[in-house]
């Protein structure tokens, strides 16, 4: 396909591991982007227990726009840095094996980068579940009560934000701050955007940029993800204490208050009965989750709606426990 040299070249970059379920669809949607300039895709492949590496090689053999590089550690920031190093263009658009670009996404991020002069431009994560549990997760991830008030989750007006989903970067802005910090195996996007903003650059949220994301679809996988995310958020806050906010402290406070309430209540069973009032703390929290989850899920199908309170509780408690353990 011929390209228009008046348009800047774009390198889409991503890192994958155990993504055989989504990789082909993700890559095909990226390559189907209607962008007039040169477009390449660089995929860093980590050690996988499924057919991810074979599928990536097949895609590279079929499509000359696809380049595959190794990510021996399998860790996300290492893979992203390896893909960026192999990319040939100065506009870098991040992709993800669980995410799907809508038509025109690349052209729009290039336009917004040029119009705003920002170092990074991104939009909303639009989670879509493939089963009842994942649909409940998708709802929780879009709810201020579920995951907090970040614009890329819940929406908002265009303008500077602390972080955005995925993002489209100017290479010079990433190189100026040293790329992704490979210490942060989770939360590396937020941490990178923090350093970009600290360097005097702008991270721009554009609500019209919406990327579909497939969330975890089992309780175990979702709880594990939230536990590790909470732990790594604490590590980010330890390195960047100025980033501390009540939104990040709320889940660990809920965990602490609930555990303390249960312990005090159990002491009351054997000593002073009035201490049993401590049990009211976790009970009030669970009642609140049930009520809010039920009303927030009014637009879900019945199986997903029934699961939403559980998903919200797992999200809060797993995230908070991970934060406290500093996983």
Task: Describe every region a protein language model picked out.
Residues 70-87, 108, 164:
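Glycine-rich, basic loop-to-helix element that forms the pyrophosphate-binding segment
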Residues 100-135, 214:
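Conserved donor NDP-sugar-binding/catalytic core segment of glycosyltransferases
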């Amino acid at each position: 396909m011929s390209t228009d040299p008046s348009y800047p070249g774009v390198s889409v970059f991503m890192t994958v591991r155990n993504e055989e379920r989504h990789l082909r669809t993700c890559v095909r949607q990226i390559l189907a982007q209607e962008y007039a300039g040169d477009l390449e895709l660089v995929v860093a492949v980590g050690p996988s227990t499924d057919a991810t590496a074979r599928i990536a090689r097949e895609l590279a053999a079929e499509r000359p726009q696809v380049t595959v590089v190794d990510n021996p550690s399998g860790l996300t920031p290492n893979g992203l840095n390896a893909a960026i190093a192999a990319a040939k263009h100065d506009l870098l658009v991040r992709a993800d094996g669980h995410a799907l670009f809508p038509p025109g996404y690349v052209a729009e991020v290039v336009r917004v980068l040029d119009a705003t002069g920002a170092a990074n431009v991104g939009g909303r994560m639009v989670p879509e579940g493939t089963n009842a549990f994942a649909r409940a997760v998708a709802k929780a991830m879009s709810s201020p009560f579920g995951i907090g008030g970040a614009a890329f989750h819940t929406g908002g007006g265009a303008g500077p934000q602390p972080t955005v989903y995925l993002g489209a970067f100017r290479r010079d802005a990433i190189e100026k701050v040293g790329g992704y910090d490979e210490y942060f195996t989770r939360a590396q996007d937020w941490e990178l955007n923090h350093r970009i903003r600290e360097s005097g650059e702008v991270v721009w949220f554009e609500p019209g940029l919406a990327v579909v994301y497939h969330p975890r679809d089992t309780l175990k996988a979702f709880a594990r993800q939230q536990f590790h995310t909470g732990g790594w958020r604490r590590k980010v806050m330890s390195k960047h204490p100025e980033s501390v906010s009540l939104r990040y402290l709320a889940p660990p406070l809920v965990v602490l208050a609930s555990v303390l309430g249960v312990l005090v209540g159990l002491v009351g069973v054997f000593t002073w009965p009035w201490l049993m009032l401590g049990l009211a703390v976790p009970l009030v929290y669970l009642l609140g989750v049930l009520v809010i989850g039920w009303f927030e899920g009014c637009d879900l199908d019945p199986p997903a709606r029934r699961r939403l309170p559980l998903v919200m509780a797992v999200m809060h408690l797993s995230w908070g426990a991970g934060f406290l353990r500093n996983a």
